[in-house]
């Protein structure tokens, strides 16, 4: 965050944040409201939500939704972390892909026909048409997402400029702590759910406010969220579904329904299920997203009605600093998308999916807490933060 501010000389900082489920197809550790507090305490001025219909998607759709929201908010610059760290290389890669589009598409098809996942086929196709010096490594997750951010900016004819910060020491998927002060999201998650884990083991890797809020969430609600806690719900749902039922679920394609229904029969945990389910053709992340759509009962028809090929249909405001509130007040008339401070009365197909996702997210809580949290989510107004006193209002 501090590096971003230093690089962009920004007046205000806006974060677009996923809701209950994330791009890798897994539940967020804590609710979006606690994560909003974390962001505000770390220097973000406006926190807005990326709807489920965009957030639990491949990089291209995820980026398209995020950029459309930032564009609507009249953001002048976007900054993202990447393994490459040189913004010129991203533009070079996009240019090469555009110039070699026919060859690129042919290679992707060729590698997919050989049994590779779309992500792997894309990465291999890039390796064949790009020289490594001035182009990015498209096998790296943050490079892929950054590439799609810039593509979305160009496709939406936005005047937004892009900047990138190089990720050091730790890669996104690293499962262990390889550095004294920098750790991957994956390694932090793994540590939090290990036996006899404590927050002291991750304190040197995350901001103090974040550690405090994580501990507070676990103390108040008795748990952090991961896939294993939803597995009994997930397995029950699958055991009551037919292949035809499953084919209606978003991202269930090419006979995947039969493999899912076969592997669930003998799986006693989500991790074991995923180990049995994964193939060369389907990445772990792609399968986790499909599982998330099964859990939330998100159908192809619902995603079609949400019209995700276009921009996000609204801006759900989750939190703001005093500076962020001033920015919104000054620019409100210029912002074309409706800004939602709660969702109780707003109606849209995208929001229907969102409500289901929230219901599922809180399903692991005991009653009456579960019902209270779900009701509160729809009526919850944006969290306000006074950055001069470092206090929530």
Swiss-Prot record:
SUPFAM superfamilies: Nucleotidylyl transferase
Uppermost EC category: ligase
Stored Pfam families: HIGH_NTase1
GO molecular function: ATP binding; ligase activity, forming carbon-nitrogen bonds; tRNA binding
UniProt main location, coarse: cytoplasm
UniProt GO cellular component terms: cytoplasm
The keyword Nucleotide-binding is assigned to this record: yes
Disulphide bonds in the chain: none
Positions with a binding annotation for ATP: 81, 142, 167
Keywords noted in UniProt: ATP-binding, Cytoplasm, Ligase, Nucleotide-binding, RNA-binding, tRNA processing, tRNA-binding
Catalysed reactions listed for this entry: cytidine(34) in elongator tRNA(Met) + acetate + ATP = N(4)-acetylcytidine(34) in elongator tRNA(Met) + AMP + diphosphate
GO biological process: tRNA modification
Enzyme Commission code: 6.3.4.-
Localisation: Cytoplasm
Entry similarity comment: Belongs to the TmcAL family.
HAMAP family documented for this protein: TmcAL
Function of the molecule: Catalyzes the formation of N(4)-acetylcytidine (ac(4)C) at the wobble position of elongator tRNA(Met), using acetate and ATP as substrates. First activates an acetate ion to form acetyladenylate (Ac-AMP) and then transfers the acetyl group to tRNA to form ac(4)C34.
Protein name: tRNA(Met) cytidine acetate ligase
Source organism: Bacillus cereus (strain AH820)
